[in-house]
Amino acid sequence: MANFFYSRITNRSYSTKNLLNIEDKGRLKDELEKTRQTNICEICLHPRGHRASVCRQILMGFAYTSKTVLEGLLSTMPHDDAPLGKIFVTDLPPYDEQVPQVLLMQAAALVTSYEYSFEDLAYFLVLPLQMALMQKSPSLGKDFPVISGYSITKDSVHSPVAFGRNLMPRGVSCEFPQIDVLYDYRGFLEGGAFSEGVTSFPKETKKPKVAVIGAGISGLVSATLLLRNGIDDVTIFEAKNVVGGRAHTHFFKGEPSVCAELGAMRFPRSQACLFYLLEYLGINAMTKFPNPGTVDTGLYYRGRSYNWKAHSLPPAIFNRVHKGWRTFLHAGFVDGVAAFASPFTLTECLRLRNYEFASSLWQKWLDAFSSETFSSGIERIFRGAHPPGGEKWTRDVDMELFKELGVGSGGFGPVFGCGFIEILRLIVNGYEDNVMLLLDGIEEIPRRLSQQKVGSYSIRDRIIHKEVKEIIRTESGISLAIGEGMHATFDRVIVTSGFTNIQLRHLLTNDDSFFSYDVNQAIENSHMTGSSKLFVLTQNKFWKAEELPSCILTTGVAKAVYCLDYEPDKPSGKGLVLLSYTWEDDSHKLLTFDKGERFQILKRDLAKSYPRFADLLEPADGDYDNNIIQHDWILDPYAGGAFKLNRRCEDVYSKRLFFQPLRLNGEPDGRVCLAGCSCSFSGGWVEGAIQTACNAAMATIRDAGGLISGDNPLTNEFVNYHY
């Protein structure tokens, strides 16, 4: 591609350097330096076409843009009809290894008020610029570059001296470590810990007898790790007659291919440990979960229904809220002169494994927003002096609209009282994007885990279906009261029970003999969220035939409705409607109604917004007993709630619980380790269950005298965040 341009100052023509084929940062830097030395003084143009009076006021600027805009500019410049799309001009070079592309993206969004994607900044042109025209983006902190720039206009288009590809670092992995943990647990599992083992015991060391309480995913992963890594005597206690815990899948009678996820339901692709387990166990049947906006969605607000077509902008009434939230995701938040990293920036730092940047940016959010509820944090950001999107939200309308629209998976109104950081954490960790539905059901994971054979026995053979009552320290070890006057003694115990059981049945927080005061406080005061679901197996997938929305968000009783297709290759097959998925107060008000009454209440409520949908909604074969299923997690005697959700100022509880087995905070060796998603930074998500299982199993082996080879959670230097 040859491009020749004419300089009005030097009265000479010159060609631009085509650097598109250069993919080595060092070589690109050398070529651009040669270009600067050769051309910068000869072709410098003031934006109005005047000769620059002082050459040292001119710098070599980089105009970042998309491939389409680049090709258009090269084919028409320097003529006035040059096509201009989203172009961001800055002094930041395209070969800087220390600056991720995402920082350029956030700076561009802050300076120009546009929303940029990676594709929008994938190419560059080298332009002569006058320094006085540059505008600095707000600083993210002393450890981050101050990026100067401006948005190009018709009047300031200059003839480029070179063009090429943006080689700044960019993350590509869909899986990445969590922001609070910054450790590659998948790498640890993949490195042999979950298969052949990575530990050994000296000959003189007696291997411990270990009990695992709870046969949910965390308990079964803990047991697998113990057995694979040399602990031979492992017993699992499970109070229910099935395995899985909150990974609870209900299969309908006579329909083995359609299942209702009563517990964990959405599985973000960013969860590295979860998808390692799925691959390891050979579970690969999945489809996209029908989150709002990813499918045709119905919205019901103040007595009126609005239709939102898949992958398009939401209805006009939601414009200000949608634009503001999208801008926040990409541009972050500016509070005076301080800028806070956008969630997208933080996520990209995680993808790049740039833990130094990620931890510094996250700590800034923690310092400023840990004491905010989700509601007060949203008001501070969108009703303050510099709201993302440029328009302040109104309290009476926009805040209500945001409660219904939510942050990706639906309305968050019922949990507006939880901590702002807790919800921001979900977004940064990628839990609201690229969410999958497992067609075999999440319970397939614990089922296959329990079928594994290690040594002479399967893990299922090691499960005793009895409830553990009190856990007592004795001179000979840890005694478990398992009912009817029976006791069993173990050297070490891993507890994956819910907090209510740990406190009121196991009595582990009665004193400080097992855990420190701080850990006991975290167990007793962590907030467990109430949640209810009601599913209806339908005769057919009526919403498809009638072109009705596959997802409905309403301000009524139902709150969120999802139509699920477990047999996409079978158009005439049964359908499944999650008629109501509610949290907290919205869940609590339904508790006194049985499933028949509840179904009629929800159907009547839905008829206000989508009467045709309500008319067609009936259980298959008219079987109300078998084809309607509901579950209220706050009433589950062994769960005590659906998932942990931190309130303001309580993120430190997650820190205490997550690191309890590692004893990083001076914990006593009480011979009891905690595990489970509620002991993680991601309550209710499978990822946290697996991470804490790794911590507990490896700590149990270490404390019993085992030797662990290679990188592992016990030797990792975790970031000591201040919550």
Curated annotation (Swiss-Prot):
The protein's annotated pathway: Plant hormone metabolism; auxin biosynthesis
Gene Ontology process terms (BP): amino acid catabolic process; auxin biosynthetic process
InterPro entries from the UniProt entry: Amino_oxidase, FAD/NAD-bd_sf, Flavin_monoamine_oxidase, Glycosidase, Trp_2-mOase
Pfam families per UniProt: Amino_oxidase, RolB_RolC
Keywords of this entry: Auxin biosynthesis, Crown gall tumor, Flavoprotein, FMN, Monooxygenase, Oxidoreductase, Plasmid
GO molecular-function terms, A-Z: L-amino-acid oxidase activity; tryptophan 2-monooxygenase activity
Catalysis performed (reactions): L-tryptophan + O2 = indole-3-acetamide + CO2 + H2O
Gene3D superfamilies: 1.10.405.40, 3.90.660.10, FAD/NAD(P)-binding domain
Cofactors named for this entry: FMN
Enzyme category, top tier: oxidoreductase
Residue ranges the record marks as coiled coil: none
Binding positions (substrate): R266
Binding site for FMN: S218, E238, R246, R266
Cofactor note as given: Binds 1 FMN per subunit.
Family label: Belongs to the tryptophan 2-monooxygenase family.
The protein's name: Tryptophan 2-monooxygenase
EC number(s) reported in the record: 1.13.12.3
